[in-house]
Curated annotation (Swiss-Prot):
Gene3D superfamilies: 3.60.21.10. Activated by iron and manganese. Its cofactor is Fe(2+); Mn(2+). Hydrolyzes cAMP to 5'-AMP. Plays an important regulatory role in modulating the intracellular concentration of cAMP, thereby influencing cAMP-dependent processes. Can also hydrolyze cGMP. Its EC number is 3.1.4.17. This is 3',5'-cyclic-nucleotide phosphodiesterase alr5338.
Length: 266
């Protein structure tokens, strides 16, 4: 048993909000599915220290979608940090998602842990890529921050998820990211979104965790685009001062059916 209380974190990802709350995506209301997740987060609020949002918070990148998101988050009153995904507009996010408990900071500390959030999005592209500037910044942050357990987050998976159509849009320069991470043994976890499903793999001593979407879920290990009937979800983590951690996936009730005929949307 650890002597110090852990940091309790919720990771939510791939919300895909739209400018109009009445719009639907893949047959469901992404607003309604997100509010179902928010209801569960409200129940968990007394035990949560931090909310991490790992990209594709909007589907259309509109200011209206981010204004709606900021409104919902205001009521939650949990320290919240975010990073952009391929559907997002980082400029609009920077302007809007930085009020109250919502922060646009990309490097911070909580408890005995360091947190570093990376922008892997590329304008008008589905795949991810970390610029040389971003990689240099990551390296400098890891040098400068205390030698404490560290969590890194980005939107795109740096590892294959064994689903051919998703793997084509993963992080395109993963080896450059690994080259930085491998120099710093304090890095314990890398969180990401984009894949709309649970994923867990270890590379060296670092664990890479992907999480379900708050809306529709992709069929795992599918060669082509496919959606399954799994419920909206998010990830919960407890981070202990000694660098150990635990995690689980939470699913929330959502009754509206997904349309059988859909179009590809990461």
């Amino acid at each position: 048993m650890n002597e110090k209380l852990p940091i309790s974190i919720a990771q939510i990802t791939d919300i895909h909000l739209l400018a109009s709350e009445s719009q639907r995506l893949q047959g469901i209301s992404t607003t309604e599915s997100f509010l179902a997740v928010m209801k569960r987060l409200e129940e968990l609020r007394p035990e949560l220290d931090l909310l991490l949002m790992t990209g594709d918070l909007s589907d259309d990148g509109t200011p209206e979608s981010y204004e709606n998101l900021q409104h919902y988050l205001n009521s939650l009153q949990i320290a919240t940090y975010w990073l952009p995904g391929n559907h997002d507009c980082a400029i609009a996010m920077d302007k809007i998602l930085n009020l109250g408990m919502v922060s646009r900071r990309k490097s911070f500390q909580r408890g005995n842990w360091n947190f570093i959030l990376l922008n892997s999005s590329v304008t008008d592209c589905v795949y991810g890529y970390l610029s040389a500037t971003t990689l240099d910044w990551l390296d400098s942050e890891l040098k400068m921050l205390p030698n404490n357990p560290t969590l890194i987050a980005l939107h795109h998976p740096p590892l294959s998820v064994n689903s051919a159509w998703i793997d084509r849009s993963c992080l395109q320069n993963s080896q450059e990211l690994f080259a930085v991470i491998d120099r710093y043994p304090q890095v314990k976890l890398v969180l990401f979104g984009h894949i709309h499903q649970e994923f867990r793999r270890q590379r060296h001593n670092v664990h890479y965790l992907g999480s379900p979407s708050t809306c529709y879920q992709f069929q795992s290990q599918s060669t082509t685009f496919a959606i399954n009937q799994e419920l909206p979800g998010f990830r919960l983590l407890k981070l202990y001062a000694d660098g150990t951690w635990t995690t689980k996936i939470e699913r929330v009730p959502y009754s509206l059916p997904i349309e059988p005929t859909v179009t590809v949307s990461y």
